[in-house]
Amino acid sequence: MESFAYVLILTLAIATLFFAIAFRDPPKIGK
């Protein structure tokens, strides 16, 4: 169960970084 929580926190951190960069700069990913 600890590994699941660790992966969840890690994914959340990566998602936060991704959204911070995506919203700060013009979205170049996808187009």
Curated annotation (Swiss-Prot):
GO terms for biological process: photosynthesis. It is a single-pass membrane protein. The chain crosses the membrane at residues 3-23. It comes from the Bacteria. Keywords: Membrane, Photosynthesis, Photosystem II, Thylakoid, Transmembrane, Transmembrane helix. InterPro entries: PSII_PsbT, PSII_PsbT_sf. SUPFAM superfamilies: Photosystem II reaction center protein T, PsbT (SSF161029). It is found in: Cellular thylakoid membrane. One of its GO terms (cellular component) is plasma membrane-derived thylakoid membrane. PSII is composed of 1 copy each of membrane proteins PsbA, PsbB, PsbC, PsbD, PsbE, PsbF, PsbH, PsbI, PsbJ, PsbK, PsbL, PsbM, PsbT, PsbX, PsbY, PsbZ, Psb30/Ycf12, peripheral proteins PsbO, CyanoQ (PsbQ), PsbU, PsbV and a large number of cofactors. It forms dimeric complexes. Found at the monomer-monomer interface of the photosystem II (PS II) dimer, plays a role in assembly and dimerization of PSII. PSII is a light-driven water plastoquinone oxidoreductase, using light energy to abstract electrons from H(2)O, generating a proton gradient subsequently used for ATP formation. NCBIfam families: PRK11875.1. Belongs to the PsbT family. This is Photosystem II reaction center protein T. The gene is psbT.
